[in-house]
Amino acid sequence: MTMRMKKLFSILAVAATVLLTACDEHQDFPDTAMKVGHILCTDGKTMSYEDYQASGKQAIAVVFSINQREEMEGKGYAVYLWDIAPEAFADSIGVEQDTSCDLTAYDGNKNTFALYGTTDVKSPLAERVFDMWRYGQSAYIPSVAQMRLLYHAKDIIN
């Protein structure tokens, strides 16, 4: 055999091996990634609405944004489903509370800690938010940028 024939034979052998290789059985694996519109339950699990209905678990929030930016902390954002008493929003105390005024920062968590940690006066809203932590989620008052994300997702999550 000439060198050219050996090379051609090798190429044909590799091609035949690749073409004759097959899977035993195709398996579809379920998509378990968190998505916008998924339900966050009190045990910290997220699931599709259909799975939630069948689970018998208690919902606490709806996912409205998935973390795809470095400046966002956590895996994503979810909006709380239950109402907070209106008096918690009656906070016109006029005291500097070291919160950010940056309209583009995703710093709601930092701002909530600043409100909660103020020693001069207490923020009723921050106290109510910290009361929610019995479920293990890191609930906080959203920043302006986080509220914009929620606004843009309103048609998906409603």
Where do the protein language model's features map onto the residues?
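N-terminal secretory signal peptides that target proteins for export/translocation
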Residues: 1-5
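Sec-dependent signal peptide recognition
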Residues: 6-13
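C-terminal motif of bacterial Sec signal peptides marking the signal peptidase cleavage site
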Residues: 19-22
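Extracellular adhesion/carbohydrate-recognition regions
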Residues: 26-139
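Beta-edge loop/turn motif
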Residues: 136-154
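Cytochrome P450 catalytic domain signature, combining two hallmark sequence patches
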Residues: 156-158
